[in-house]
Each structure stands twice: as structure tokens, then as C-alpha cells.
């Protein structure tokens, strides 16, 4: 069972071992149940840092490696991550090259974002449709949050 409010604590040892045990409650959910959790899951990394460590979480190699593994084995995870607090953006920052500025926030390398986002759109659309579900609206919202402009004809010709 997931903790209340969709918060998933990820302990330091689990990160070091690249253990996905914290995500296991999601593995048993049917696709429809997963989609019902869209925009509601928060990953809470318990990763101690000294007060003078200026790095963002996405700059910590161990957290990036854990996130890469989670993304590879749970390709639907970005759909579930909460968007308004930056959970989705932080997760994608763990996966893709990016820069950060105080005025603009995270800016993804455009080619990397386009490749990852297009791949993820195809993958999750196929996955959801294979289960008789449609999550295109949700995928479009996810893309918009990441600053990826989806052409209106993107879905044309895809069954």
C-alpha cells in the first residue's frame, strides 16, 4: 500500500543499492489504477547533504542512477509524478542533460527533451491503448509541463 498523499520515501540505502522496493506497491496496480494516480505521486529522497553542498538533487550521481533505473523499469512513472511542485521536472532532470538558471529554472537540452518526450509519448500511448485506455490528454499535459510543444497533428495516423 502506498503511503498517504502519494508520497513515496526512498531511503539512502535503497538509492545506493538501486533498489526499487519503494515503488513495488505500484507494480501490482492495473494500468487503469496507475492512470488514476496521474499527477499525484511524490518521490521523497532521503539523501543527506552538507549545508555547503550547492548541488541540485539531479546533480547527485547516485540519485541519477536510481532514477534512470526507475525510469527504465517503470516507464509510466513520469505520468504518475506530481507536476505543480516540480516532481515531474526533477525526475526528467535526473534523466536528461539540462541547465539551471535562477530566472528560468530548469532548461532541458532541446534535442534530448524532444527525443525522450517523443519516445515516451509513443511508448505510453501504445501501453495505454493496449489496455483499452486513452491517456493522450494526460500525456499532452505532461509534455506541456516540461516545455515540450506538441504539434496538434502529433497523434494523426496513430491507432
Predicted regions and their residues:
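Residues that form ligand- and interface-recognition hot spots within folded domains
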Residues: 47, 70, 85
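Generic short beta-strand segments
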Residues: 40-50
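Short, structured motif recognition centered on aromatic/hydrophobic residues
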Residues: 64-70
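Glycine-centered motif in EGF-like
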Residues: 1-39, 53-59, 74-158
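One face of beta-strands
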Residues: 41-43, 66, 79
Amino acid at each position: 500500500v502506498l503511503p498517504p498523499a502519494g508520497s513515496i520515501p526512498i531511503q539512502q540505502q535503497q538509492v545506493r543499492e538501486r533498489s526499487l522496493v519503494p515503488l513495488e506497491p505500484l507494480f501490482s496496480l492495473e494500468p487503469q489504477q496507475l492512470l488514476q494516480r496521474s499527477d499525484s505521486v511524490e518521490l521523497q529522497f532521503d539523501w543527506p547533504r552538507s549545508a555547503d553542498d550547492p548541488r541540485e538533487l539531479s546533480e547527485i550521481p547516485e540519485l541519477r542512477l536510481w532514477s534512470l533505473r526507475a525510469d527504465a523499469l517503470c516507464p509510466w512513472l513520469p505520468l504518475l509524478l506530481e507536476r505543480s511542485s516540480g516532481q515531474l521536472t526533477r525526475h526528467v532532470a535526473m534523466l536528461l542533460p539540462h541547465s539551471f538558471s535562477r530566472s528560468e529554472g530548469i532548461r532541458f537540452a532541446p534535442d534530448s527533451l524532444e527525443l525522450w518526450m517523443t519516445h515516451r509519448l509513443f511508448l505510453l500511448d501504445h501501453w495505454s491503448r493496449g489496455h483499452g485506455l486513452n491517456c493522450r490528454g494526460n500525456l499532452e499535459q505532461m509534455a506541456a509541463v516540461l516545455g515540450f510543444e506538441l504539434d496538434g497533428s502529433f497523434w494523426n495516423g496513430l491507432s
